[in-house]
Amino acid sequence: AFQYPIEIPGVSNINFLKTALAEIRAYKGLAPLDAKEFLQLSREKQKLVEFDAKLVNRSLNEGFSGGEKKRNEIFQLAMLEPSLAILDVTDSGLVIDALRIVSKGVNKLRSSNNAFIIITHYQRLLEYIVPDFVHVLYDGRIVKSGTKELALELEEKGYDWLKEESREKATTI
């Protein structure tokens, strides 16, 4: 998922997903779903992640609001079921209701068979998605790891203390 999902005029959401899913299934040695199976799966996943059915036939992200684009990405995750998903600042620009819906979708998709790397600059998203781990990147490296409490500490103190700690470690090496 992208911070700013791109629009692809002329490619419907449903055709994009049908093609992507067929390629994934072919890679796994599985036959493509027939039209009835695909539409049934699509309806199930739309319901699961609270995705507006009228968006599936529109061009991919074209004219979508920021929240609709993010919800569309969660719908894509539901349909494609990747084992690893990277959500790059998926909370960027979302109003609180959209943030709740997107977070609920991510939580419904979490399982022991997949992993999510969620990149965020704010603790707010973590009120809805409780992470197993929190890692702080600075200057291209992980400088601190912890639990949700680390995110709360960052919200309270900011990042400067970690930057200083990171510089001190770099000079002692």
Spell out what each predicted region is.
Residues 2-83:
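ABC-family P-loop ATPase nucleotide-binding domains
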Residues 82, 86-93, 97:
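Walker B catalytic motif
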Residues 99-112:
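Helical segment within the ABC ATPase nucleotide-binding domain
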Residues 113-129:
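Conserved H-loop
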Residues 133, 137, 141-164:
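Conserved beta-strand-loop-alpha-helix hinge in the C-terminal portion
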Residues 163-173:
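ABC-family P-loop ATPase nucleotide-binding domain
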